[in-house]
């Protein structure tokens, strides 16, 4: 009985979840790649991308499905099935994965490098993000599922003005006991932006072999530590974080993401044998955003995921400036040689592996900064 009792420890189950996902990915990887190759599910490279990427044409894509399968099996094996946060993260992950799958399918079957129309993709992302945001506004605030509906009714009965408990406040890192109450509408708006924004940010970063998956593993692992802290009464009290009942179980899911991500990196490292595609990138980004919201570390996610943030900003700045100058001068001008930012460095002479490893190093440093907020407050 004592041997069985050790499985009550979240830390042990997290280690086992990581190992299980890693093993599933390593064992199933070659078969999945072989099957994708047989089905001719190859990457269609954009004509306006770097010329060096033309050799990647035909490389199997949609390998993110392998990541999602490994995460799901490992999580269901080792996580608590009645934990609401585990389920909401899984649902968001697979919801965004479905969007990515449809996008990849269009690219592969119709040989359309652009994939699903941007407006259609954004509509589904916005819908899933909004549903998750509304649920989390009350799930994070209520200690148990039985209190969700009463809390919602109380908010409606107050004329939509009732504030949320302090555990739902926006936490400002590096400052002791500094947080800002968001209210239901503010919480929903911020959560929606974090989930949808992170999903797209990871997707934009996924442009070089191994570039997106390793930062995802590092950021996801760090969020697992935050989940463990805020999910325990003793640690959260000692470190001055809000106590979120049930959040500690997300450490198991984060560990599964880490294991599955490392397994995928085995095959995605340069020269990549398979790409994750939108099915993987959108899903993993959605997962990171959702977990960060639950553990109340939206700003820390912004810090640790700095590579994702800068990649996204580079695209936004490039597009905005190009449209503005085209309208004003009749010819569009660019700030970067090419966007996202990793292509800017490629065109500037950096080797693909140099860009990837340097972005990994930057992410590792940013993650350490994020983890330092556990104590430096």
Swiss-Prot record:
Primary location group: membrane
Source organism superkingdom: Bacteria
Record has Cell membrane as a keyword: yes
Ranges in a coiled coil: none
GO biological process, alphabetically ordered: cell division; cell wall organization; peptidoglycan biosynthetic process; regulation of cell shape
Pathway: Cell wall biogenesis; peptidoglycan biosynthesis
Reactions this protein catalyses: UDP-N-acetyl-alpha-D-muramoyl-L-alanyl-gamma-D-glutamyl-meso-2,6-diaminopimeloyl-D-alanyl-D-alanine + di-trans,octa-cis-undecaprenyl phosphate = di-trans,octa-cis-undecaprenyl diphospho-N-acetyl-alpha-D-muramoyl-L-alanyl-D-glutamyl-meso-2,6-diaminopimeloyl-D-alanyl-D-alanine + UMP
Membrane topology note: Multi-pass membrane protein
Cofactor: Mg(2+)
Full protein name: Phospho-N-acetylmuramoyl-pentapeptide-transferase
Name of the encoding gene: mraY
